């Protein structure tokens, strides 16, 4: 597992882990995610009224903290386990982004010390398909960090950092799936 740590101008951190799982586990996570009952994200209600056809699909996983840790093998990922120690799972969900989906900067939580875990579920993703995750400074005046949705990448970051996915390219053949969770 390859780890990189990035400190933003406000002192908040982003931890990036690559090659977290073998291909078989990546595929099992993706297949499980694809069987969840997706709904239109409530944040897109205004888009639905305007009959926009491309939107973000989202679903709560319904996993307990123990189930989530087991599925994501948190206990086998020592650096991630250490970051999440003394924290409780608040919520977890899956997003399926498509091209032309509306994306907005947001924070996952508003409690100091909360951490977000973002896992890119796709087993294949071409650089030309876009779908990057972008983190901004607190007043949204500049971009501080960008991550390519590399298959098998796991990112842990301060939940207060404003971030958003960028839209996927129209040439991407599938949704860009992410497993998300917030810990406090």
Region annotations inferred by a language model:
Residues 1-85:
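Non-heme Fe(II)/2-oxoglutarate
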Residues 84-184:
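Catalytic core of non-heme Fe(II) oxygenases with the double-stranded beta-helix
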